[in-house]
Amino acid sequence: YNEGYRYVGRYLTGYVGSGSTARPKAMTKEELSAVFSAGLRVFAIYQDNNPVVSYYTYEQGLEDGVKAFNAAKNLGVPEGEFIYFAVDCDMMDYQVTANAIPYFRGIREALKGKPLYYKVGIYGSRNTCTRVSDEGLAKSSFVGDMSTGYSGNMGYRIPTNWAFDQFHEYVFTGASVNFDLDK
């Protein structure tokens, strides 16, 4: 908070690395508590896949919607917060139509009627975020603008519902910590 930040974006599930170097990337209850104790807010990110276009289907959206909901609830993410579902691959416009939009329809269906409600957001390229949001399937966009070579970022405007725009990563050095930080 003292460094000027107000939000912390963290993954709900998953691992980075593979084999003996695999380590969890998921936020812990202790980490969430520390975020709140520091006066910060959290936004949750759901990405539990090796992002390829074929992953994104209606059926996968149903499954991921339930997994993300359960992870957020079990972690203690406050009701009403966004979960940003990641579409972290370069989709051509026709693939957004054929894959990303059905995936988010599955997420919407999976979250219908849940007793603790989270809002659906999207992480992805400018075009993917815009198209999914224009379908009414995401209320907020976390734009992956660091992926400057993605066709979905080239020549497309930033979505009107953008909340976060990831455009740079650097090593943050604090009083007793160093870590990669996306801006």
Q: Which role fits each region the language model picked out?
A:
Residues 6-11, 41-46, 81-86, 119-123, ...:
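Structural recognition of the beta-strand scaffold that forms the well-ordered cores
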Residues 10-92, 97:
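Substrate-binding cleft of extracellular glycoside hydrolase catalytic domains
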Residues 112-131:
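Aromatic-lined carbohydrate-recognition surfaces of secreted/lumenal glycan-active proteins
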Residues 129-183:
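Functionally critical loop-and-helix segments that line ligand-binding/catalytic clefts
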Residues 12-15, 47-50, 88-90, 123-129, ...:
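Active-site beta-loop-alpha junctions enriched in small/polar residues
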Residues 89-115:
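Active-site cleft segment of glycoside hydrolase catalytic domains centered on the general acid/base Glu
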Residues 1-32, 152-157, 166, 171:
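Cell-wall polysaccharide-cleaving catalytic domain and substrate-binding groove, primarily
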Residues 1-3, 36-37, 76-79, 114, ...:
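Extracellular/periplasmic catalytic domains that process cell-envelope and extracellular macromolecules
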